[in-house]
C-alpha cells in the first residue's frame, strides 16, 4: 500500500471500530437487563465475552447438527442464559461480523505498515511505537509539504500559541516576555482552502489534526515511557528534571510539568522523523530553529 491507501485503510478501520463500539454498548444495554437482578456489578467486558461464547456454542451446534436457529435455541435452552431468541442471535451475529471486519482491516494495515520503509527503517526502532501507531504517522504526515520540522509540530498541534486577553491583545509577563501556551481546540486561525467551485477561499478553524495529536500525546507518549525507549524516554526525564528546576516553571502542577515533558519528547521524535524522511525523499533538510535562529549547538539527530 502507498501512503494514500494506508490513510484510507486507517480511516475505514476507525469507522469500523466506532461502529463496533457503539454496537457493543447497545448489546450491553440489552443483555444487562437479563442480569439486572444479580447481586454483583455487571462488567461489560465479561458480559460481552459471555455473549460471544454463547454465540459460538450456538453456531457450532447449528453447524454440527445441521439444525435451524430456532431448533438450535430450543435444543440448547437449558444451557443458554443470554441468547434465548432468534432476534438476539441475529444482533450478536451482526456484532460478530463487525469484530471480524475490524480484525481484517487491522491485519491489512499491519501488513502494509510493516513493509513501509518509514516503519522498517525508523519507527520500528522506537520502543512503544507499533504498526497501528506508525500507520497514523505515515498516513497523516507528509515530508513533501513540511519544509521545516516545525510544520510537523504544527500539523500535530504541538506548536505554541501566543496568549491573548479577551480583546485579542498579547499577554506578557513581568519582564515583558510574551506568554504562550500549547495549542488546543479553542485556538482557531484563518486559513486558505479550495471550495467546491475550485476557488481559493478562507475560513476559520483548526490548523492541526486532532486525531493525530490525540494518538501522539494520548497514546504514543505514554507507550514510549512504559517501553523505556533508550533515547526518547531519556529526553522526557531529562527535560522534566530541567523544567522542575527552572524558576518560571516551579509553580506549575506536576501534571502540567509532565505534559510539557511529554510534548517536548514527541517533538524531538517528530524532528528526528522529519530529518530522516526528508533525507529519504531527497528533499532539503534545514537545521532546527534552535540552531538556525537561536545559535544553539546542534545535538543528536538534528540534521
Q: What spans do the regions from the language model cover?
A:
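Long, charge-rich intrinsically disordered scaffolds of nucleic-acid metabolism proteins
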Residues: 1-115
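Phosphate-backbone recognition surface of nucleic-acid-processing proteins
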Residues: 122-123, 137-259, 263, 276
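Basic, amphipathic alpha-helical segments enriched in Lys/Arg and hydrophobic/aromatic residues
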Residues: 253-290, 298-301
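Coiled-coil termination/hinge junctions
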Residues: 101-143
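Short, hydrophobic/amphipathic alpha-helical patches that form generic packing surfaces
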Residues: 4-25, 29, 135-140, 214-222, ...
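Extended non-catalytic scaffold regions that mediate assembly and binding
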Residues: 41-51, 176, 182, 198, ...
